[in-house]
Amino acid sequence: MTVVSVEHALAGKLPEGGEVTVRGWVRTLRGSAGLAFINVTDGSCFAPIQVVANDTLPNFDEIKRLTSGCSLIAKGVLVKSQGKGQSFEIQASGVEIVGWVEDPLTYPIQPKPMTPEFLREVAHLRPRTNLFGAVTRIRNCLAQAVHRFFHQNGFNWISTPIITTSDAEGAGQMFRVSTLDMVNLPRDASGNVDFSRDFFGKETFLTVSGQLNVEAYCLALSKVYTFGPTFRAENSHTTRHLAEFWMIEPEIAFADLAEDARLAEQFLKYLFRAVLDERGDDLAFLAERVDKNAITKLEAFINAPFEQIDYTEAVKLLQNSGKKFDFPVEWGLDLQTEHERWLTEEHIGRPVVVTNYPEHIKAFYMRLNDDGKTVAAMDVLAPGIGEIIGGSQREERLDVLDARMAQFGLDKEHYSWYRDFRRYGSVPHAGFGLGFERLVVYVCGLSNIRDAIPYPRAPGSAEF
């Protein structure tokens, strides 16, 4: 007897009347006149499959006691369903109960609406819900599409280090990695912590970005990307921030900001097309329960050409909008989410690429423009969320890079390896970063980024 996934059983590609076996968990059960109708899910798709068990089965009394969350193996004949809302069902010839729910009344995942706040408290069980099953499958679809896009376009995937000595953003919000005894810290003659006695012989941190490391491979392999975990010790209790998240960071050699922006547009549209093509069932659920525009916003995003405007122009548009914003709009200040959303939703009505930001509000590695006041940086803004991608052309001129590092108070000797790229065959190059969880939030219409990752890490929260 063939073991199949629920998705495969419901797809209509198996012979009707054939014998199959499915393995999964009970979503719901109802009984009627010697019959038990068991909705079984294995996580392979949004819909469950109905298993119909009758009272001729030797363990029918056991079957009737099944509750949500119990695990089972059902064998039987695959037939077209007579009921509404399902294409096929299984007429069971046997139901083996693998695992019971210890106390159904206290089982946290009940077949009823539950708030995201409650589900964060039981994050180890929340993938069993409709919502987080859908989010997880979409997250997986996006991750697979990321690698597929870059592979098809000739990029090499680079594994950048998680433990590092460099602050790629220059912001200093890094988690320290140490094996020193926190109670009896070794001190040097000046009374400072002696990190020479630490595991690596120096002060080390969790990475905030793989960009600096991946640039090394860009300047040898031309087109590369990294996709991995990053960490920010930013004490932000917001719906938009995580302490641990995943970043996608491509880097392209012999490229300027315009080419970087084109890559970002192609990339996002490819990802959204993949989700529409592969996860329609999950998107339909999200459109019904979470974000009514879950499908239409992705279709609109794919079909709309990106608008590109200069930061200075964006500031003028905002100042002349007549709208009262919570945050001030002035040249030299970074754009806030409310400003970004006004540009994309109320003024332009489609994705926007804002370019050429003031040099003092962007990172040291971004290429200084000829005006000396702005850098070749870009933010891709999406309706409904604001910034979704941040990128730039990198500073390839050693003297200018050194001046920028001095401006930011960075020790150029500490970054000597990064400076080497400008000393040995330097070329113009560019790249961007996309926070993967922010992408999941946008696609799924979630209101809190802590629901876009299996086990959220945030200030004061590191459970499981």
From Swiss-Prot:
GO molecular function, one term: ATP binding
GO cellular component, one term: cytoplasm
Enzyme Commission code: 6.1.1.22
Keyword Zinc-finger: no
Domain of life: Bacteria
Keywords: Aminoacyl-tRNA synthetase, ATP-binding, Cytoplasm, Ligase, Nucleotide-binding, Protein biosynthesis
Pfam families documented for this protein: tRNA-synt_2, tRNA_anti-codon
GO BP of this protein: asparaginyl-tRNA aminoacylation
Keyword Nucleotide-binding in annotation: yes
Reactions mediated catalytically: tRNA(Asn) + L-asparagine + ATP = L-asparaginyl-tRNA(Asn) + AMP + diphosphate + H(+)
InterPro entries in the record: Aa-tRNA-synt_II, aa-tRNA-synth_II, aa-tRNA-synth_II/BPL/LPL, Asn-tRNA-ligase, Asp/Asn-tRNA-synth_IIb, NA-bd_OB-fold, NA-bd_OB_tRNA
PANTHER family: ASPARAGINE--TRNA LIGASE, MITOCHONDRIAL-RELATED, ASPARTYL/LYSYL-TRNA SYNTHETASE
UniProt cross-references to HAMAP family, sorted A to Z: Asn_tRNA_synth
Subunit structure as annotated in this protein's UniProt entry: Homodimer.
This protein's name: Asparagine--tRNA ligase
Organism: Xanthomonas euvesicatoria pv. vesicatoria (strain 85-10) (Xanthomonas campestris pv. vesicatoria)
Taxonomic path: Bacteria, Pseudomonadati, Pseudomonadota, Gammaproteobacteria, Lysobacterales
